Design a protein with these regions (language model features):
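Conserved catalytic/acceptor-binding region of the Class I
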Residues: 110-111, 117, 121-188, 204, ...
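A short acidic, Gly/Pro-enriched loop at the edge of an enzyme's catalytic core
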Residues: 85-97
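A short SAM/SAH-binding and catalytic strip from SAM-dependent methyltransferases
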Residues: 95-109, 132
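Conserved class I S-adenosyl-L-methionine
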Residues: 1-34, 45-49, 64-69, 73, ...
């Protein structure tokens, strides 16, 4: 699902995650000198923001292509190829563990969050965030396009878990604090957006790559309609639920 180049991921989702990273880091209360683990670091949007804050940063990422990109880009970060469910650090190694736009894609999210708790010291922070269903306008447009062309396609809630406040709070558990974060991304024209979907990562990219030429043309026209048939530059909004707790 994420077997794509760093450039393809960044064009599709990185443009949002780079903007989300400082807002999420503020929510998690990350300051200089803290030992912070970025779980599911991807191409490094959040890890780079944490490093800019002079935190002592480590990163776990399962995809080999992203691990290589992280190591090349963020020389000060301790990058390890690892899944969230099996983090290769001792107990209480960090002041905070954070996961941006990741928990939906963990093979076992409760186990992943339990591992985040394990590696955080007592009194430290565990924080996650995920897009809020269709209110992430770009993904919402993709999802509505899919369902318009094929009504048997699942809704965002059916397709992926942990895209609502309630499910994320349930995942984090007792003491959860929640905030809805908002970012924007600008596109110079519709073709810029459409090219990111065709080459993109995650479920949207898998779907786009499965289309034949006729289906792809129909999908393009429907998605153009879903984003308001823009004639020039336009902006899409992404909203994400962020949830944090303090380890007892």
């Amino acid at each position: 699902m994420f077997d794509v180049s760093e450039a393809a991921y960044d064009k599709f989702m990185g443009r949002y995650s780079v903007r989300l990273a400082p807002v999420f880091a503020d929510f998690a209360g990350i300051d200089a000198g803290q030992r912070v683990l970025d779980v599911g670091a991807g191409t490094g949007a959040l890890a780079a923001e944490l490093a800019r804050r002079d935190a002592v940063v480590a990163a776990a990422e399962p995809a080999p292509t992203f691990v290589a990109a992280l190591r090349a880009r963020l020389l000060s970060v301790d990058v390890r190829q690892a899944a969230a469910e099996d983090l290769p650090w001792p107990d209480a190694s960090f002041d905070a563990a954070v996961a941006q736009l990741v928990v939906t894609f963990m093979s076992d999210a409760p186990a992943g969050v339990a591992e985040m708790r394990r590696v955080v010291r007592p009194g430290g922070v565990v924080a996650v965030c995920m897009w809020d269903g269709d209110s992430m306008e770009m993904l919402g447009a993709v999802n509505r396009t899919q369902r318009t062309l094929d009504p048997s396609q699942p809704t965002p809630e059916q397709r992926t878990l942990y895209r609502s406040r309630e499910t994320l709070e349930g995942l984090i558990g007792e003491g959860a604090q929640t905030e809805l974060l908002e970012v924007e991304s600008e596109y110079v024209r519709f073709e810029e957006l459409w090219s990111t979907v065709i080459d993109g990562a995650g479920p949207a990219g898998v779907w786009a790559k499965s289309l034949d030429d006729e289906q792809r043309a129909a999908a393009r026209e429907e998605m153009y309609r879903q984003v308001g048939s823009p004639s020039g530059a336009f902006t899409l909004v992404g909203r994400a639920w962020a949830v944090r707790t303090t380890r007892a």
